[in-house]
Amino acid sequence: LGDVYKRQDAIHAIAKKHHLVVIEDAAHALGSEYKGKMIGSMSDMTTFSFHPVKPITTGEGGMIVTNDETLYKKLVLFRSHGITRDESQMTRNEGSWFYQQIDLGYNYRMTDIQCALGCTQMKKLDRFIARRREIVERYNEAFADCKNIVTPYQLPDTKSGWHLYIIQVKNKDRKEVFDALRAEGIGVNVHYIPVYYHPYYQEHGYKEVHCPVAEELYTHIISLPIFPKLTDEQQDEVIEKVKDLCIESI
């Protein structure tokens, strides 16, 4: 969540011991690093999201990366109705026009326009991530002396891409702070609501679930604006209003 990586080594050790495939959800972690390695280069498969609020976007959709040729071929089939034109996978070939459906698959292909947008965005990724890190440094420095604000912690051996910047508001009513910031036109949000709070999950056996740490965090968290085109002047305005609300009584 919000690109927080931990226990990677332990996960991969368990997978190796028990001959398991590691499928890594990196929807929030494009451009991040763990122990000097880019996220997406360590697991058997890694998924990324290109939703509009992510570090780069294709409008919607995402990508899966793998270095395993067998998994790659399965993924290519799965995204395209299980259809192939690869002669080595077909039972016969009647010509260059010929194809076969050899497995169950779906229409999970991006459009050409989305792909073109994604390729262009990917070239800008390093610049986007660098700017996000600058914004985080400015937030952290600005809030360092504010006892009512807990800034996000970056684990050792990690370099976050900072998809989100989530603070915890202490000794203040989170909803009042949130509403006051929204009233000032600042696009704050809350990421996320514990899943078992939703009616669907409560109706399917999770009504009595309690995760005290998640519940405690949920009552305090607010996500502040972070995106590459956020100017220093705009960020200073956010910082000023957040500090005013968290230092003084509302």
Briefly describe each language-model feature range.
Residues 41-85, 112:
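Active-site PLP attachment segment
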Residues 1-5:
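Short, small-residue-biased leader/transition segments that mark boundaries at the very start
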Residues 6-17, 33, 69-250:
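PLP-dependent aminotransferase class I/II
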Residues 24-57, 73, 97-102:
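Conserved active-site segment immediately N-terminal to the catalytic lysine
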Residues 24-25, 60, 112, 225:
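Acidic active-site catalytic centers that drive phospho-/nucleotidyl reactions
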Residues 26, 49-52, 67, 121, ...:
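A secondary-structure boundary/capping signal
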Residues 20-21:
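Hydrophobic "anchor" residues on beta-strands that sit immediately upstream
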